[in-house]
Swiss-Prot record:
Native organism: Helicobacter pylori (strain ATCC 700392 / 26695)
Name of the gene encoding the protein in the UniProt record: coaX
Function description: Catalyzes the phosphorylation of pantothenate (Pan), the first step in CoA biosynthesis. Can also utilize CTP or GTP instead of ATP as a phosphoryl donor, albeit to a lesser extent.
Annotated binding of K(+), by residue: D102
Active site residues per record: D87 (proton acceptor)
GO terms under biological process: coenzyme A biosynthetic process
Compartments where found: Cytoplasm
Subunit structure: Homodimer.
UniProt main location, coarse: cytoplasm
Family: Belongs to the type III pantothenate kinase family.
Coiled-coil ranges (or none): none
The protein's name: Type III pantothenate kinase
EC numbers, comma separated: 2.7.1.33
Residues reported to bind substrate: Y81, G85, I86, D87, R88, T157
């Protein structure tokens, strides 16, 4: 980016997180999302800074907003992990100590200590669990039912499928987190947080990390 422009107010730019299914935006503290087919209708006039994990959706954004800038190279997250996704990096950048859980199409769990990424793991997202059950056996093709508690054992196939799915995710998070604070983001964050007493939902976590990256690069100068 030639002679990087700097901004003193978040209101003057738009942050964009390009996912595998939808494209998410943050303008100041307003969050919204779009399918790739609807991007042009948004009519965004401000400078767009983005990250992307999906090449096709990234091309769709650039077709509509050719001046949008990829900020993947604007920062460094201390880690020995090879191939850490840019969305995971941004979420981790926003946390100094704790466990970051992004509960989207996949569920990623990452440990951060004093700003360093220690490692993490990846689980299927809740929707992917349902898809896997469906492929395994017809009787396991059950609709998702939100559970109120994991303390009561299931007494139906539908409840058993949902119980096993949710418990496997919660148990993995708790095993890695121990007593550390858990920061949740992604579409299923609020649901999972009900089973995790040391957790807090941070809907803007990835965007918070993007703000930090822009500040480190001298592009965003507001406090």
């Amino acid at each position: 980016m030639p002679a990087r422009q700097s901004f003193t107010d978040l209101k003057n730019l738009v942050l964009c997180d390009i996912g595998n299914t939808r494209i998410h935006f943050a303008q100041n503290y307003q969050l919204f999302s779009s399918a790739k087919e609807d991007l042009k209708r948004l009519g965004i006039q401000k400078e767009i800074f983005y990250i992307s994990v999906n090449e096709e959706n990234e091309k769709a954004l650039l077709n509509c907003y050719p001046n949008a800038k990829n900020i993947a190279g604007f920062f460094h997250l201390e880690t020995d992990y090879v191939g850490l996704g840019i969305d995971r990096q941004m979420a981790c950048l926003a946390v100094n100590n704790g466990v970051v859980v992004d509960a989207g199409s996949a569920i990623t769990i990452d440990l951060i200590k004093e700003g360093k990424h220690l490692g993490g793991c990846i689980l299927p997202g809740l929707a992917q669990y349902i898809h896997a059950y469906k492929k395994s056996a017809k009787i396991l093709e059950q609709p998702f039912k939100a559970l109120d508690s994991l303390e009561v054992l299931p007494k139906s196939t539908r409840d058993a499928v949902n119980y096993g799915m949710v418990l496997s995710v919660i148990a993995c998070i708790q095993h890695l987190a121990k007593n550390q604070k858990i920061y949740l983001c992604g579409g299923d964050a609020k649901y999972l947080s009900a089973f995790l007493p040391h957790s807090v939902c941070k809907e803007r976590l990835v965007f918070d990390g993007m703000e930090i990256a822009l500040k480190k690069a001298g592009i965003l100068e507001c406090k």
